[in-house]
Amino acid sequence: MIEPLTHTALDGTAHGFFTRQGGVSTDLYESLNVGLGSDDAHSRVLENRDRVRQYLSATALVTAYQTHSTVTAFVDTPKEAIKADALVTKTRGLAIGALAADCAPVLLADAENGIIGAAHSGWRGAF
């Protein structure tokens, strides 16, 4: 079962800081690996991504091909392999995410304007 960390500052916005629990990946990638660029079995990654998507009640989940940059991409439809370290959308039902290991994931929400953001804040892009 997926049980992400959430924060009251984002109440009213479907969100979560997902841990490794609740997925189907094994061995090195155990368990909730959602990284399309990993060497994990593609079918497992897709199942994990679908579990996150369902948790968020989203129609699609978009993550970037993170490059440790300051590049931000605006996403209005499901896409893959966008080279960026931050994603922004105002499309209802579209979940966006930032993957992190030793970097910081940052979630942003502007409820008044219906805009959300997800950023991968690494040493190069944060400074």
Predicted ranges, named:
Residues 1-17, 21-22, 27, 55, ...:
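Conserved nucleotide-ligand handling architecture
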Residues 30-43:
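Short, His- and charge-rich active-site/binding loops that engage polyanionic ligands
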Residues 23-24, 36, 118, 123:
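Gly/Ser/Thr-rich helix-start
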Residues 12-15, 31, 61, 95:
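A residue-level signal for beta-strand positions that form part of recognition/binding surfaces
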Residues 42-124:
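Phosphate-centric recognition/catalysis
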Residues 27-32, 74-76:
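Short, glycine/acidic-enriched capping/hinge loops at junctions between secondary-structure elements
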Residues 19, 31, 118:
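Short glycine- and Lys/Arg-enriched binding-loop motifs that mark or flank ligand-binding interfaces
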